[in-house]
Amino acid sequence: MKLTKTALCTALFATFTFSANAQTYPDLPVGIKGGTGALIGDTVYVGLGSGGDKFYTLDLKDPSAQWKEIATFPGGERNQPVAAAVDGKLYVFGGLQKNEKGELQLVNDAYRYNPSDNTWMKLPTRSPRGLVGSSGASHGDKVYILGGSNLSIFNGFFQDNVAAGEDQAKKDEIAAAYFDQRPEDYFFTTELLSYEPSTNKWRNEGRIPFSGRAGAAFTIQGNDLVVVNGEIKPGLRTAETHQGKFTAKGVQWKNLPDLPAPKGKSQDGLAGALSGYSNGHYLVTGGANFPGSIKQYKEGKLHAHKGLSKAWHNEVYTLNNGKWRIVGELPMNIGYGFSVSYNNKVLLIGGETDGGKALTSVKAISYDGKKLTIE
């Protein structure tokens, strides 16, 4: 018996369907939030973050396939690393991990995984910028990385916190000084970086004509790059969106309209949103923010999210003819998972939901220009 629920949402001017009859994917063995992943052929790789030092694979073309654990990642447990696939191999960069003193620190190392023999190799290179909050995607023979926190500033904050020991007053003083700054004073990465595995070289692909971001949704499809929102300083997101295009003269950028606000709500931008393409339509969903933070920032409060609660979201947006609109909602709030475009669907793998609870679920969303389907 086919169990489908269809709702015509007049406020959204879209039909969306929850389908229990389409292909379903197995849950992850463990909840993975703040991790990373990539697609190689028909196989998706997901790991790290709350998954520890583990990576798992799933053959998407096999309806009966289950997740399989691959060789343990040799770089140790870490959150918010960047990953991408080039020439059939998986590359993992950076992240945030504890050192021997117990300090959370940005790391800028790089590793390669070869599926043919299930082995990892540490690469003789280091990223030229901090890679926490960075977003990565591959194009041709390169990995492109956008945004990220400043290594020295971020590491210094955690070093100072550990040095404060049990002195809560000192910790409060450190936090107040850290959050009470303008966005530009955090020195988020404002260059588009690339890494070319064949030459083991990093390249500055040009300065982005917008503020540095952390946790932005970043997607490359063909020669087009799309950047949606992200943090512009700790606790403060932006609703701005941008589009780039690879040309003979480098990446040419233009601004897109801001992401619209859901009905009856403010739009405080999103960090940790998930994105991809379905039937040629760009989709972005989920993410988290602090409702009211943009208002407080405009009122002159640099610690923009002070006193506010973090919120996770479920709206699904699409970009059509240069305009954004909301076409439906997920059955749950989600953020900081891994998303990948596959077979005209966008897979939403893991992530976290309200309160930061790690998810094991694998959802698929698709959109044909009229109807959003959620599996």
UniProtKB/Swiss-Prot annotation:
Taxonomy, superkingdom: Bacteria
Keyword Amino-acid biosynthesis on entry: no
Residues annotated as transmembrane: none
Main location: periplasm
Active site: 231 (proton acceptor)
InterPro entries, per the entry: Kelch-typ_b-propeller (IPR015915), NANM (IPR056734), NanM_proteobact (IPR019936)
Subcellular location: Periplasm
Signal peptide: 1-22
Record's keyword terms, sorted: Carbohydrate metabolism, Isomerase, Kelch repeat, Periplasm, Repeat, Signal
Kelch repeat coordinates: 43-87, 89-140, 142-176, 177-222, 225-273, 295-344, 346-375
EC number: 5.1.3.24
Family: Belongs to the NanM family.
HAMAP family from the UniProt entry: NanM
Quaternary structure, from the entry: Homodimer.
Protein name as annotated: N-acetylneuraminate epimerase
Organism of origin: Haemophilus influenzae (strain PittEE)
Lineage of producing organism: Bacteria, Pseudomonadati, Pseudomonadota, Gammaproteobacteria, Pasteurellales
